[in-house]
């Protein structure tokens, strides 16, 4: 079920949401968090699909804000998605012009679920300081993606400088499988001093830097980053050089 509201207000959106929920037999009390997605015009569909997939495991209220021209007259349009692809979740898509093009606490707060955690996600850009952003200040978790920045390594470095508890970057999340497999591999091997760690990957991938830093800290060994220019390769090989020989883990199909 999808309802479209043109040139509307937060109050009218809430009223329509209540009417749809009553007609659909839906209760917001079953939702565990509010996910606020701050998307860019022309790139929002992929972010919405990802948010819906995530909400299948954690029923949520998803609020997607899409910025349009800030110089246009003030206008707020909304779509309310209930049921169907959203499953047990609900999604409110806001399109803002003029003053409504800026995602602020004043604009979003009236749509938040009461007494539930707030997660904010920037899928296409990296804010100057996530914890000081108008919505970042009220969120318990702030998710960025430094890989989307023009200079991912510099973006990651800056995020580290302004880090506050609750900040998360997807460059670290993408390393979950690598870290799990490497830890399991090292646990199975006899103890031997590590001479050096080499991490191969794209020179633009912040995950390469993060994994190298993590391994150097955990193994107390020097790290060499063997970076290349091809951004689409990402992280593809790790070699741990020990006194009793080398251990290598790599992505199949990539040399």
Label the predicted regions.
Residues 1-120:
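An N-terminal, globular interaction/scaffold subdomain
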Residues 15, 20-24, 212-214, 224-255:
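C-terminal structured domains
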Residues 43-46, 205-206, 244-251:
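Short, surface-exposed beta-strand/loop "edge" segments at domain boundaries and coil↔beta transitions
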Residues 51-55, 108-110, 134-137, 212-218:
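Short, solvent-exposed amphipathic alpha-helical segments in soluble enzyme
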Residues 61-70, 121-123, 144-149, 222-232:
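A generic structural motif
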Residues 77-84, 136-148, 239-253:
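Acidic, Ser/Thr-rich peripheral helices and adjacent loops at domain boundaries
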Residues 90-183:
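Internal, hydrophobic cores of structured domains that mediate oligomerization or house catalytic pockets
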Residues 170-225, 233-234:
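ATP/pyrophosphate-binding catalytic subdomain of soluble kinases
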């Amino acid at each position: 079920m999808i309802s479209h509201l043109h040139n509307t207000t937060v109050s009218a959106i809430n009223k329509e949401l209540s009417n749809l929920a009553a007609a659909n037999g839906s209760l917001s009390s079953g939702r565990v968090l509010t996910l606020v997605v701050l998307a860019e015009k022309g790139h929002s569909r992929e972010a919405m699909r990802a948010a819906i997939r995530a909400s299948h495991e954690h029923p949520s209220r998803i609020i997607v804000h899409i910025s349009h021209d800030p110089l246009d007259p003030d206008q707020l349009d909304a779509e309310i998605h209930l049921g169907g692809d959203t499953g047990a979740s609900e999604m409110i898509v806001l399109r803002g012009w003029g003053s409504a093009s800026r995602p602020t606490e004043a604009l979003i707060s009236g749509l938040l679920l009461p007494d539930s955690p707030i997660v904010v996600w920037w899928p296409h850009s990296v804010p100057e300081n996530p914890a000081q952003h108008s919505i970042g200040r009220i969120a318990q978790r702030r998710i960025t993606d430094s890989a989307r920045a023009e200079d991912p390594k510099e973006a990651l470095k800056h995020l580290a400088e302004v880090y506050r508890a609750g900040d998360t970057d997807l460059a670290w999340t993408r390393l979950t499988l690598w870290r799990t497999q490497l830890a399991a591999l090292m646990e199975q091997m006899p103890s031997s001093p590590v001479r050096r760690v080499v991490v191969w990957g794209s020179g633009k991938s912040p995950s390469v830097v993060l994994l190298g830093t993590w391994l150097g800290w955990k193994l107390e060994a020097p790290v060499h980053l063997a970076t290349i220019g091809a951004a689409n390769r990402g992280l593809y090989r790790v070699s741990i050089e020990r006194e009793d020989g080398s251990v290598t883990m790599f992505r199949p199909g990539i040399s």
